[in-house]
């Protein structure tokens, strides 16, 4: 895997309070960048979230500016060079949506977070429209499954109707609310069992969906319901193909709870496998390919005087080709 192929640059987007920043924290935890994940709950910060670093974000429990974070990640059991993951945690509130729209010009894919109880909301529709205009592939994470919410099939129907994209579940919840026991990873055929408030996965086992072991681990009633629902999933939704995802025709769907770490690691593992590496960028005159040796890029965000101790300006640049060299002049 060369330097281009191993890069994954994506934005996490959603309507306010769906759980973007909490999901970002869990990704950073699995990436080894932090030891304890912060979270935003009821607009209060439970341990300051890494990406919500501004004073106003800490005080109000919301993201007002896009934060950019990076870590190396290699899924368990995989050998070789790790993927270089760049996360852009975006604001959800409409007052700061221009920041999010600019950020979406600089990413190769996006993860949309949806509240399982509220479903598709106003800002989710607007952000999906931007992704569709730019032909940006999206993965959808149905969050807060540990709370009482809507039937998963109803949520999937709403996703297709409101976001105007075909969906394909790659994980499936076992129970919901107080009965939520974890998720079945359809993509890797694994049963993932969790304990609330744990920072790591409690147990992950490969189990045949028809085996008696499934009944022993989740209970006969839950196992029977899971088998029935997975049969419906296979009958209703198309077989997943990576190319249809990368061409933005189909959105893979995962279920879980970012706050309690349900379903997060399998989302991250699948994402680094299927998400696109840097793609060619359409310039005014031609298509710029990432493997071209000459440096080119564009500024998608500028911040000034954020830290009162440092009166400075920071420009965030999306590299389209070549390699950026410090202290070298570049021209518009």
What are the residue ranges of the model-derived segments?
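Structural and coupling elements of P-loop NTPases
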Residues: 1-332
């Amino acid at each position: 895997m060369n330097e281009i192929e191993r890069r994954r640059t994506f934005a996490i987007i959603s309507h306010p309070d769906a759980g973007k920043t909490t999901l970002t924290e869990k990704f950073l935890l699995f990436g080894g960048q932090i030891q304890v994940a912060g979270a935003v709950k009821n607009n209060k910060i439970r341990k300051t979230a890494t990406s919500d670093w501004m004073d106003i974000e800490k005080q109000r429990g919301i993201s007002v500016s896009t934060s950019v974070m990076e870590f190396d990640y290699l899924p368990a059991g995989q050998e070789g060079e790790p993927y270089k993951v760049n996360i852009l945690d975006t604001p959800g509130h409409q007052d700061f949506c221009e920041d999010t729209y600019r950020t979406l010009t600089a990413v190769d894919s996006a993860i949309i977070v949806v509240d399982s109880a509220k479903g598709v909301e106003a800002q989710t529709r607007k952000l999906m429209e931007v992704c569709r205009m730019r032909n940006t592939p999206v993965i959808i994470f149905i969050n807060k499954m540990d709370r009482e919410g809507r039937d998963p099939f109803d949520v999937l129907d709403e996703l297709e109707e409101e976001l105007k994209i075909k969906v394909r579940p790659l994980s499936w919840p076992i129970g919901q609310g107080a009965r939520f026991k974890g998720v079945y990873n359809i993509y890797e055929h694994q049963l993932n069992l969790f304990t609330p408030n744990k920072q790591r996965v409690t147990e992950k086992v490969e189990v045949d969906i028809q085996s008696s072991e499934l009944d022993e681990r989740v209970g006969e009633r839950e196992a029977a319901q899971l088998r029935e629902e997975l049969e419906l999933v296979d009958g209703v939704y198309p077989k997943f193909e990576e190319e249809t995802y990368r061409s933005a025709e189909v959105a893979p769907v995962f279920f879980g709870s970012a706050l309690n770490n349900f379903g997060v690691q399998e989302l991250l593992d699948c994402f680094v496998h299927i998400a696109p590496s840097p793609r060619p960028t359409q310039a005014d005159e031609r298509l710029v390919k990432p493997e071209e040796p000459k440096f080119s890029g564009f500024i998608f965000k500028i911040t000034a005087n954020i830290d009162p101790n440092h009166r400075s300006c920071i420009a965030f640049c999306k590299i389209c080709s070549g390699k950026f060299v410090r202290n070298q002049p570049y021209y518009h």
